[in-house]
Amino acid sequence: MELSVIALLLLGFVNFSWQNEQAPRVKTSLGDIRGYYKISRHGRKYEAYEGIPYAQPPVGNLRFKPPQPVQEWINELPAVEKGPVCTQYVVLSTPQNGDKVTGCEDCLYMNIYVPFRNGNESLLPVMFWIHGGAYQFGSGNKVNETLVMDRDVILVTFNYRLASFGFLSTGDSVVPGNMGLKDQNVALRWVHNHIRSFGGDPNQITIFGLSAGASSVHYHYLSRLSAGLFQRGISISGVALAPWAQTKYAPEKARRYAATLGCPTRNTKEMIDCLQTRPARILSQATGEVPDIYAPFGPVVDKYGPDPFITRSPIDIIVSGEAYDVPWISGVVSEEGLYISAAFVGNDQLLKQLNDDWDNIAPYLLDYNDTLPLNQHKEVAEKIRKYYLGSNPIDSNTSLSVTHMIGDRMFSVDFQKAAILKAKINKSPVWTYYYSYRSMHSCSEIVSGGSTKNFGVSHGDDAFLVLDTRISNVSRPNDLEMQQILLDFYTSFAIEGKPRAGDVQWQTLDPNEKEFQYLHIANPQNIKMETSNDSANINFWNTIDFNENKISGQE
């Protein structure tokens, strides 16, 4: 006990000393930046530069416009406090003050964390994190960087515009869309251009993200704007082919959205001029008027703008061979569907409601309301239910099957398709994984409103174990070991160009094999390569002709 107290006192003294010594400073072509020192999870000193603007504030006439380059500053920039989060409607929880709207429009800021170099001139690999949140919520500010700072990599986190501010599209040149993805691109370009000033290697940038951030990573492989700005990527539970990652009927949704705000909808310029006058808070509150469980506003084909992010559908870009050809890792967890189902699987009343009204709820729950004709909705709902549940009712005994149904449809099927296509068409290696380790805490606790019941391994449980403050401060030995395995996985890929997980030889995906190959991370003592000829029940889902990911000319 005495040794522990002494260690804590020494750590506090070191921390106090570092905070009071001369602050770290860097010089960039935009101006000087001053940061501050912090301590990593296991006691390493590192530099923190928080709240760095990477684009002009998208306010006033710049609302709904592509991001504009940040201007030079004259005085030293104090980068000692994170910038505000982007305006968003809080979906998964209610803040203590009860206000569901948070953030502001002036939010395009990044945070850069750099291991203390102590005179070492070697450039460090860079990891560029893209946060998730269905393109509607979230922030790079929520990342807990302290564990990553135990390794010799630079970590960059940032905010990008969300919901209507980042993804409204009129389907023409007025607001082509994808402002949020363009924010990401400008942030990535900023890092590519300036990270050398922080001791980072602009030719060793790994982009990685979770959920919508994972699909964003995939989108950067498909955009000519981002080609050359990074050397590898990791998509954690999300790809651009996922149904929620491609917005259907975006112009119609924009008009419906504008109508709820009392704006004219016949002329898109007049409509946007009107939306420009509405307070950000009102715009954020109105997002709930656009019916979509997953992402009412998200990525679109924006070929009408002067600097389009993508001019064709993701599938067309992929099969044409035009995607950026650099290494990629992609994977899923065993109960991806908990992203949605955790809100109801522990509630018998909600399960009964889902059971009784399945035919009407299924098209929205499984996101095919816009991709199948109305006269097929009931037939497909019954077909899916029969496959996963047989003749059983939806209740606590079958809730896991419902979770797997949602996860297969929304994440796992298209993850597999995207990985195989990239491995088949491009030359760079592709690695895939399947994560089924349940730690003491889970993201399902957030979605379920605090329930600690074990519903399975939730969407986000892998990345959050390393990067999120809400569940990353773990104490169980197996959880701590898994943290290190995942940290090795992410950082070894950034440093060496090949991922490492435990002592297993992680093989690349061979698209010519009949069975899908992946690394199964079951627990710290059980990590191995596996294969499947029907992963995510993909053969069943291929029998349903959704109007999704159709190659042009083959509709």
From Swiss-Prot:
Q: What does this protein do?
A: Lipolytic agent that may be involved in distributing the venom via degradation of blood triglycerides. The recombinant protein degrades triglycerides and exhibits high lipolytic activity toward long-chain triglycerides (tested on tributyrin, trioctanoin and triolein). Does not affect mammalian cells.
Tissue expression, per UniProt? Expressed in several tissues, including epidermis (at protein level), fat body (at protein level), gut (at protein level), muscle (at protein level), and venom gland (at protein level).
Q: Please give the Gene3D superfamilies that the UniProt record associates with this protein.
A: alpha/beta hydrolase
Regions annotated as coiled coil: none
Localization, per the record, is: Secreted
Recorded GO terms, molecular function?
carboxylic ester hydrolase activity
- Intrachain S-S bonds: C86-C107, C263-C274
How do changes in temperature affect this protein's function? Optimum temperature is 40 degrees Celsius.
Q: Identify the glycosylated residues.
A: N120, N144, N369, N397, N473, N533
Give the range the annotation lists for the signal sequence: 1-19
Q: GO CC annotation: what is one?
A: extracellular region
Q: Which UniProt keywords apply?
A: Allergen, Disulfide bond, Glycoprotein, Hydrolase, Lipid degradation, Lipid metabolism, Secreted, Serine esterase, Signal
Q: What GO terms describe the biological role, i.e. biological process, of this protein? A: lipid catabolic process
Please list the residues that make up the active site: S211 (acyl-ester intermediate), E336 (charge relay system), H459 (charge relay system)
Q: What is this protein called?
A: Carboxylic ester hydrolase
EC number(s) on file: 3.1.1.1
Q: How does activity depend on pH?
A: Optimum pH is 8.5.
Q: What class of enzyme is it?
A: hydrolase
**Species whose genome carries this gene:** Bombus ignitus
Q: Which PANTHER family match?
A: CARBOXYLIC ESTER HYDROLASE (PTHR43142:SF1)
Family membership, please give it.
Belongs to the type-B carboxylesterase/lipase family.
Spell out the post-translational modification annotation for this entry: N-glycosylated.
